[in-house]
Amino acid sequence: MTREETQITWNAATSKSVGQASTETSDAFTFNAGCWDAAIQLSADNDGSPAAGDLIEFRILYTNGDILGDSGDDFDTAEHAALIAVLDTWASSTPGEDPARLTVPLPTMAAKGFMLRASNKSTGRAITVRARVVELVGAIS
């Protein structure tokens, strides 16, 4: 068994500042064909002084390949993507901290891969997001 770690990228960068009331989508990630377990660590770091409502929602847009038959990967649509986490950067919330980090198990469920969608619910500040996938690959010894 090996442990493979991969940084999720956003237009080839390892982090993305998501503007107030904005949404950003990561580059596509492809699972290793031998992956049998996976988790994703999410990070949200407020670009200013956090206030009430400074939240980031993370949704996962899985792909199982080319459902449309047009030769490209087809991902879950944005409004139907699964909510995997909400991180609150305001310390007075419970939970709430800046930066905020959370690790979430990913059901590999034979998915080919995914994209990550980060939606900033703040009306006043940008929030920088990062994500890292850890896969367990190969036989258990």
Briefly describe each language-model feature range.
Residues D45-L55, D66-L68, K121-I127:
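Extended, low-complexity, turn-rich repeat/linker tracts enriched in Gly/Pro/Ser/Thr and Asp/Glu
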Residues D27, A85-R125, R132-V134:
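Beta-sandwich interaction modules
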Residues F31-Q41, A51-L55, M109-G113, A126:
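Extended extracellular/luminal ectodomain segments enriched in beta-structured repeat modules
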Residues M1-S43:
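Solvent-exposed, flexible loop/coil segments flanking beta-strands in beta-rich domains
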Residues Q41-D45, R59-L61, R117-S119, R132:
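Residue-level recognition of well-ordered beta-strand positions that form the cores
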